[in-house]
Amino acid sequence: MVEVPSFRSNEHFPQLCDKVTVKWDKKRGRFVEAIEDIPIGTVVCVETGITVNVDPQNCYRCLKITENASFAYCKNCEEFYEPDEIACGEFDELGIFKLAAHLVFSYPFADIASLVQSSDPEPPSCAPKALSTQDIEAIFQLTPFPEIGEAFKAPAIQNAIKRIVESLETDENWGRLDQISRTMTFTKALRIMAERSAKNAHTIYSIEQIESQEDNLPMATGLFPISSIFNHSCTPNISGFFVRNTFIFVSQGVRAREELLDSYGVTYHQHTFEQRTNFLASVSGFICHCESCFKMKSLKVLEKPKKYPETIATNASCFTDITSYTENIPRGSKELENLIIAFARRPDSETYTELIFQFWKKFVENAKFRGITYDPYLVRPYVEMTILAWNKEVGCENEEKMSLLIVTHRLLRNCYVDLHPLSELVVKLVNVVANQNADEINRTLEKLKLRARMLWKYSEQSEDL
């Protein structure tokens, strides 16, 4: 489990912080409510989920990078029992059923066996008094998606069930059941887990993958039953990120008696109403009725993107082409930010140190005009400006340098609890700047620049402007 020293656990809901409680009503079902004001940067949830790898270089169970990619588990997880066929990826093509099978083996056999003798668990109709990820009841309280039951008729699923049940014959618990009972028990347990995973499971990307903005293979999929209590809003007041198999949420500023609301992948300030509606319907299976969708719909500057900024940035023959194009982009349009990111990936952009510094300033001003004032989205431009601020060609005054560094440090601390890949170096830079050690400042800046370039996948192919 990832350690978060600042986290203060709730007595009744150990994965949630002590500033919240869980409630229920007919409209929202279960929801998380603040019992007092929760300042920006406060950790509100730390949940180690039940996960299975997608990328084979990650441990099947905890998602650490394995020393040997041909072995499914890391050293700490190799004692975990589960049929080897699942852990070694033989059922990867079955998607959510791989996670569902893993869930069956993640809880005590007695809890799983009792499912055969009882009716299917019903979604809750009241607020729980206590709940933990370690309790199978946390899984049962998730809203099921019964339609997935049809998939059990597929030959591939039936064959997988048969193989797994046969492999359990020598298990000290499952082996006590005869073949028919073992098949019935496993099949029902698998179905219940699959129904609750279908619309509640998360696809897991690391911070590095999110920052690189590339279509990488996800690390894993997983179920986080406590985190799943957070409802969606297109204007959320919490934000979350993954560190291996741990889901961490931080407050973006929540008032007492307000509901804590997450974004399920789309927001009012970054996506049009149509984009949000289509995404939530296809991925999460619901229509959003938050205030942004019900009243405000879309920001006009997001409605009509012009061209592909990546193509413009790549094909520009001179810097004037870029600057003249930006002058025609409407204020607040995300197109400007995408153009700056695309242009910054060109190694030759560093030839224009002062101008690219001003570009990142425009990025922040443009995002703020759209309503993005304190958000993980602003980490990159502030890190880029901090690195450039100490460049002599930029000519920043000490006051501006310190201001940029402080904002960068606070963003990383308040949005990522200093668990961002660049956090350690930014903290070090704050310390060496305070000590006024010029040589150490330069060395730290070079390390920060190198790590940032690796994180944001700068192009290695240079084109002359």
Swiss-Prot record:
Residues 18-265 form the SET domain. GO terms for molecular function: methyltransferase activity. Coiled coil: none annotated. Pfam families: SET. It is an enzyme of class 2 (transferase). Transmembrane segments: none annotated. Its EC number is 2.1.1.-. InterPro entries: SET-MYND_domain_protein, SET_dom, SET_dom_sf, SMYD4_SET. The keyword Ribosomal protein does not apply. Keywords: Methyltransferase, S-adenosyl-L-methionine, Transferase. GO terms for biological process: methylation. The keyword Metal-binding does not apply. Belongs to the class V-like SAM-binding methyltransferase superfamily. PANTHER family: SET AND MYND DOMAIN-CONTAINING PROTEIN 4, SET AND MYND DOMAIN-CONTAINING PROTEIN 4-LIKE PROTEIN. This is SET domain-containing protein 3. It comes from Caenorhabditis elegans.
